[in-house]
Amino acid sequence: MASNAVENYLKAIFQLNNKVKDGATTNAIGEQLGIKAATVSDMLKKLDSLKLINYKKYHAVQLTKKGEELAVSIIRRHRLWEVFLVEKLAFSWDEVHDIAEELEHIESSELVNRLDDFLDNPKFDPHGDPIPDRDGVIHRRDQLPLAELTPGDKAVVTGVKDSSSSFLQFLDNQNIQLGHEL
């Protein structure tokens, strides 16, 4: 059983390695988690000793197979909880992230699988991010950033890169949601 802090680090490393050009550097991890670089370095050494990451000072951190499996499991739990909160408890998409951050640390695989079944096995969370399946497979879809469209192009909103509450509220105020045609 991993601590909440360990789970948060693994999730951050996974996300950074999949979204940021330079990958999960000490500074990038610290920035994402709101933690000082020296504290991050200490935790990275611990994660390396647990064989969850491959850590080499001044290089981007890579997850081991075990670390990646844990990270994907955490992301699966988080995104399923977001779907539950939006679809079943009527939270708006800008309210669910922080609540899901707390719920994601419940480790019962039986609970997560039942939640998945209860929600009819959703493929994407309320922000358009893919939900890993029970085997840890992430089914991504082709997406194009809005900035790459040219005037006159039509597109359907399938996800948002910025899932901050303020940005999601801005989109709501503009009546832009997932599935909205532009």
Language model features with spans:
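N-terminal helix-turn-helix DNA-binding core of bacterial DNA-binding proteins
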Residues: 4-35
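Charge-rich, N-proximal long alpha-helical rod segments
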Residues: 23, 41, 55-57
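Short, hydrophobic-biased segments on the C-terminal half of alpha helices
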Residues: 44-45
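All-alpha effector-binding/dimerization core of bacterial HTH-type transcriptional repressors
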Residues: 77-92, 98, 102-110
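Basic, amphipathic "hinge/linker" alpha-helix immediately C-terminal to the N-terminal HTH DNA-binding motif
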Residues: 59-78
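Mid-protein regulatory/catalytic core that forms ligand/cofactor-binding pockets
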Residues: 104-182
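A short, conserved structural fragment
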Residues: 48-56
